[in-house]
């Protein structure tokens, strides 16, 4: 008789955002007259930029003619996109990354979950706490997390690096040396970031201890401060210890289009084995490439028109972040984030738990956010709001929160 992967049975409950959706749907059904404003899941609301739409239309037209039709994409992605990524996101910033070290995919979420497949099962992982749930859950699925403690909401074989107000929501080096370190800056969910010097410290730590860093840079486009690195490869030595994940979802609004990429330098090795070669083998076996029309849309992100339009769009969301941050601060909340990231991290009032505040916000302000405890034990007593709504709804949400 067949057997299942019983690691899936170890996962506690449903995925965080699925749980939120169920609670919101139940409330909506019971209160159909209520207008609910959603500042929870990090989905964008602004339409695709005109330069991207033009590129999509052109690519669709190409697909309608035999002479310009495209089928399966190359394993790594089309050269036109990889060259644009290498130049604009890396080489123009002084980072030594070549086009053939870039793997185009349908998004950073898939890559962040799949990258663990090329590592041995007994590798020890370290994650920031609070953390984007995908990093932990996919390692649970792979049998790498150990056993779950319901009391502490932690896994026995996962090293948690607390990110609290005391350390400005930036992790300290773990006393127990891990094999794989997950870092995300600007950070989801706290909206915090670290300086380039701090990031250099992590690169040095990884190289010294034989670790690999999986660096999620999905929110890089929102960086506004000069002392924050836009890529880990700005740091000396990163080519021998770091994998970087990037997304077109938040910088270009591709949440409904799907495009991302992973960078694995050829200098990154385990003994004599290139991780680049392992990921290439995995990629070629399990993936047939992002669609041609989507990759052409990705190329338009790097056009002069695309850059200008997307800078304006990022500014729109960051203005929302300012509205949320200032509004909550004026209302007496303790808030952080919102400077280099589209997330605002707030302390729940009156010693409420994260889920108690979720219910309070939903029922009394008709606003949906994300409970901090859903991101890990250090998130308890905190709450995340996103700046990805439209401006009018964002202003209204803050006014409704102030009236609670």
Feature roles, as predicted:
Residues 47, 317-318, 331-364:
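Conserved PLP-binding catalytic core of the aspartate aminotransferase-like
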Residues 151-153, 234-315, 322-326:
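Conserved core segment of the aminotransferase class I/II
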Residues 295, 299, 314-325, 335-347, ...:
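Conserved glycine-rich beta-strand-loop-beta hairpin in the small C-terminal domain of fold type I
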Residues 87, 91, 95, 351, ...:
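PLP-dependent enzyme catalytic core of the Aspartate aminotransferase-like
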Residues 2-106, 301-305:
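N-terminal small-domain helix-loop-helix segment of the aminotransferase-like
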Residues 66-206, 220-235:
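Conserved core of the PLP fold type I
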Residues 123, 208-212, 239-240:
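A short helix->loop->beta-strand "cap" motif at the edges of active sites that frequently abuts
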Residues 31, 142, 208-209, 331, ...:
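Helix C-cap/helix->beta junction micro-motif
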């Amino acid at each position: 008789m067949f057997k299942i992967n019983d690691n899936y049975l170890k996962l506690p409950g449903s995925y965080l955002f699925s749980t939120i959706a169920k609670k919101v749907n139940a409330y909506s059904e019971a209160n159909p007259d209520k207008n609910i404003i959603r500042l929870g899941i990090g989905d964008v609301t602004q339409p695709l930029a005109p330069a991207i739409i033009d590129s999509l239309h052109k690519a669709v037209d190409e697909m309608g003619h035999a002479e310009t039709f495209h089928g399966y994409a190359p394993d790594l992605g089309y050269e036109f996109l990889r060259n644009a990524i290498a130049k604009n996101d890396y080489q123009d910033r002084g980072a030594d990354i070549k086009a053939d070290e870039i793997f185009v995919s349908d998004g950073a979420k898939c890559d962040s979950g799949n990258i663990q497949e090329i590592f041995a099962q007994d590798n020890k992982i370290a994650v920031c706490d609070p953390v984007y749930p995908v990093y932990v859950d996919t390692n649970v699925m792979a049998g790498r997390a150990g056993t779950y403690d319901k009391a502490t909401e932690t896994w026995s074989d996962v090293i948690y690096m607390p990110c609290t107000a005391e350390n400005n929501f930036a992790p300290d080096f773990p006393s127990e040396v891990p094999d794989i370190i997950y870092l995300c800056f600007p950070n989801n969910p706290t909206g915090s970031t670290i300086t380039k010097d701090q990031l250099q410290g992590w690169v040095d730590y990884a190289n010294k201890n034989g670790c690999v860093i999986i660096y999620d840079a999905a929110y890089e486009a929102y960086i506004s401060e000069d002392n924050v690195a836009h890529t880990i490869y700005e740091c000396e030595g990163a080519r021998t210890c770091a994998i970087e994940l990037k997304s077109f979802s938040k910088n270009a609004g591709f949440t409904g289009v799907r495009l991302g990429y992973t960078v694995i330098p050829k200098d990154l090795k385990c003994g004599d084995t290139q991780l680049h070669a392992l990921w290439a083998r995995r990629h070629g076996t399990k993936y047939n490439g992002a669609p041609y029309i989507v990759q052409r849309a990705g190329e338009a992100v790097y056009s002069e028109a695309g850059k200008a339009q997307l800078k304006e769009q990022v500014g729109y969301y960051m203005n929302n972040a300012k509205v949320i941050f200032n509004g909550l601060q004026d209302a007496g909340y303790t808030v952080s984030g919102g400077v280099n990231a589209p997330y605002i991290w707030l302390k729940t009032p009156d010693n409420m738990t994260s889920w108690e505040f979720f219910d309070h916000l939903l029922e009394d302000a008709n606003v949906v956010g994300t409970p901090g405890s859903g991101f890990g034990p250090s998130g308890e007593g905190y709450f995340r709001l996103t700046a990805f709504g439209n401006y009018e709804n964002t202003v209204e949400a803050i006014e409704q929160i102030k009236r609670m």
